[in-house]
Amino acid sequence: MAPTTTMGSALYPLGEMRRSQRADGLAAVLAIGTANPPNCVTQEEFPDFYFRVTNSDHLTALKDKFKRICQEMGVQRRYLHHTEEMLSAHPEFVDRDAPSLDARLDIAADAVPELAAEAAKKAIAEWGRPAADITHLVVTTNSGAHVPGVDFRLVPLLGLRPSVRRTMLHLNGCFAGCAALRLAKDLAENSRGARVLVVAAELTLMYFTGPDEGCFRTLLVQGLFGDGAAAVIVGADADDVERPLFEIVSAAQTIIPESDHALNMRFTERRLDGVLGRQVPGLIGDNVERCLLDMFGPLLGGDGGGGWNDLFWAVHPGSSTIMDQVDAALGLEPGKLAASRRVLSDYGNMSGATVIFALDELRRQRKEAAAAGEWPELGVMMAFGPGMTVDAMLLHATSHVN
């Protein structure tokens, strides 16, 4: 006999109540929007900019080394919220030892919601329904620590209902975009009629600092990361107005064993700091296939094998070296990571927002290629971050992508 509960004089079957509260179909990506600050710096000019604003032009050998690093990043340009004028007004930002976290957080408290809102407005416009129809809001950032936070600020900025159900995620690093979408899938599938707005926004101002002759990590971070925000609307059981792009078939997360030393972050009185170890690409290359098989093997029909090339790929472009490792480990054909490499080239690594940029670029490339021939219907969206954590989802591309 099915469990029941008594409400007043009526008897309600709990199983029927639960089914009525859940969506019938899979959660899907219904719209995507992205945004960047207006300040664009090319990779070619960045070493001169960086050493000038940090008063480090006298470190000629280190500057030459940094130029070589920038040339090997696979990055052509990046967008930055911080400008030369801002850094001149805040000399503590370029002093590696000066306490400056409060000033950075105060700037981020306004800049992050504004950038996030710009991306979200684009997603809502593409979606085609009123902002007031958003039922849930999931926001993720590494750039801030104010409460009320970015999620709260977005309610009036976007015209969301005061009753929108908000969730704020902090310090998930580069896997944050996938983690937020994974949460959105659960919300959409377990709440009939839910429409979840996911926003990831990042500012490199949180960890900008001057060069250190004894710290290669500083040069790597300053030459790789950029600023950006990405927004996605997720929902199940699309109505006649909505055009689902990617159904989220499955979502999973796992940890690479004995890797927590390789990549981590923490707030100090100076800035957001952490460890970005040289072993990160190798750890990903050695473990990515096993992680994917553990997460999606049964859904993909077993052991992967050459089947990895039968999928499309939206991989977080943490660096060109990381993508080279993924290519090699999975035996991917040339061009399989073209969307991710394009995003790295055009924007740099924007932490949690980057993988959503890659998904957006992938749908553009799919639209261009659809008329030319076959394109896989199934694909993987995947990101890596502190832990080390691998967060991924199996996607099904709908006809609306074309």
Swiss-Prot record:
Keywords: Acyltransferase, Flavonoid biosynthesis, Transferase
Xref: CDD domains: CHS_like
Pathway(s) the chain acts in: Secondary metabolite biosynthesis; flavonoid biosynthesis
UniProt name for this protein: Bisdemethoxycurcumin synthase
Phenotypic consequence of M265L: Loss of the bisdemethoxycurcumin-forming activity and formation of bisnoryangonin
Catalytic activity: 2 4-coumaroyl-CoA + malonyl-CoA + H2O + H(+) = bisdemethoxycurcumin + 2 CO2 + 3 CoA
Chain's role: Plant-specific type III polyketide synthase (PKS) that catalyzes the one-pot formation of the C6-C7-C6 diarylheptanoid scaffold of bisdemethoxycurcumin by the condensation of two molecules of 4-coumaroyl-CoA and one molecule of malonyl-CoA.
Family: Belongs to the thiolase-like superfamily. Chalcone/stilbene synthases family.
